[in-house]
Regions:
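N-terminal cap/lid segment of alpha/beta-hydrolase-fold proteins
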Residues: 1-38, 87-93
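Catalytic nucleophile-loop/oxyanion-hole region of alpha/beta-hydrolase
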Residues: 17-19, 55-64, 77-124, 293-300
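Serine-hydrolase catalytic core
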Residues: 163, 176-285
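Catalytic histidine-centered segment of alpha/beta-hydrolase-like enzymes
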Residues: 257, 286-299
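Primarily recognizes the serine-hydrolase "nucleophile elbow" in alpha/beta-hydrolase
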Residues: 98-180
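Short, surface-exposed "cap/lid" segments of acyl-processing enzymes
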Residues: 23, 32-69
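Alpha/beta-hydrolase
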Residues: 43-45, 154, 283
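Catalytic active-site module of serine/aspartate enzymes centered on a nucleophile-bearing elbow/loop
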Residues: 294-314
Length: 314
């Protein structure tokens, strides 16, 4: 069934990568009124703790993000990617890198193939994601600071080596979720087929894997410990004042899934490294997904996006 949120968009799909004969899809989402010209690009990554979620899952699609793309006649590219635990963090990072290669090398030809007369503007590329997608939006901005101008990270996972992600505790109950036995995860891992990947699932599918990984503090073990997977460590290694995208972070102060204080700390780290004016943090009352009812006229969001637009649209 078509998502009513996408009723005003033309949505097409293709794959940007094949792994072990399995395609990894992306979705090109263009406002229906956009037929010609050189529109900007908004690359979107979905949430789901890197374990669940799907690029087109409607409940996690913030209406304001679609309205923002429409406002600027932007091409929104929402991509799936390999998921934990079937894959590792470096595999996901490889997918992000290859997605941008596809955008640079194949998007223009793909648009012609589907009969579109628009030409993507590679001088105006932004990334956006929610939760785990916010983490990937940040990572992609750091990986491709030559291409990405601003990053919008909504309640992003950032410090995946902190106790919230790395130490077992019964205090972690996103939205009041129950404690799930680790046996659920162990059984899934034992049944995994070698070489078979997972690339997208509409919740609640796979959330029964995300919860025990979070509650048992297994993220570093499941993801891997390579420093490139941890954005604060990546930022730490950069030179002061080095070129980086502008970063807008949005986070609800009562978030039960991803701690808001992590975003507060990350904003400080980003500003210290990339200097004043390189980042804006908007911290408002609410739980995970607190922006679900926000509109482009909501003052804190309007203010944050105006800073993004100055860098992205110019």
């Amino acid at each position: 069934m078509e998502d009513p949120k996408l009723a005003n968009f033309n949505v097409t799909t293709t794959h940007y990568k094949i792994v072990n004969d399995q395609e990894i899809p992306l979705y090109v989402i263009i406002p229906k009124g956009v037929h010609t010209g050189k529109p900007p690009i908004l690359v979107h990554f979905h949430g789901g703790y890197l374990i669940a979620g799907h690029a087109l899952y409607p409940d996690w699609t913030a209406q304001w993000s679609l309205d923002y793309a429409t406002l600027h006649s932007a091409i929104r590219i929402s991509a799936n990617y390999r998921l934990l635990p079937e894959s590792k963090g470096l595999d996901i990072q490889s997918d992000v890198r290859d997605l941008f290669t596809w955008i640079e090398n194949d998007l223009s030809a793909y648009l012609k193939r589907i009969g579109s007369d628009i030409t993507p503007d590679y001088e105006r590329v932004a990334t956006y994601g929610e939760s785990a997608g916010g983490y990937l939006a940040i990572q992609s901005g750091l990986m491709r600071s030559d291409l990405v101008k601003p990053v919008i990270a909504a309640y992003p996972m950032t410090y995946l080596d902190r106790p919230w992600y790395s130490v077992a505790s019964t205090d972690k109950s996103p939205f009041g979720a129950p404690q799930l036995p680790k046996a659920v995860l162990d059984q899934h891992i034992a049944a995994m087929e070698s070489g078979k990947i997972a690339t997208g699932a509409f919740p609640p599918e796979r959330m029964q894997l995300a919860l025990p990984i979070l509650q048992n503090g297994l993220f570093p073990q499941i993801m891997g410990t390579d420093e490139s997977l941890y954005p604060a460590k990546v930022v730490e290694k950069r030179k002061e004042g080095e070129k980086a995208p502008f970063l807008l972070v949005l986070h609800g102060t009562e978030d039960t899934a991803v701690p808001c204080e992590h975003s507060v700390d990350f904003v400080k780290v980003w500003e210290e490294k990339f200097l004043e004016g390189s980042v804006v943090g908007k911290f408002e009352s609410g739980d995970h997904g607190f922006d679900g009812t926000a509109t482009l006229e909501t003052p804190w969001l309007k203010d944050g996006l105006s800073d993004v637009s100055k860098v992205w649209i110019r």
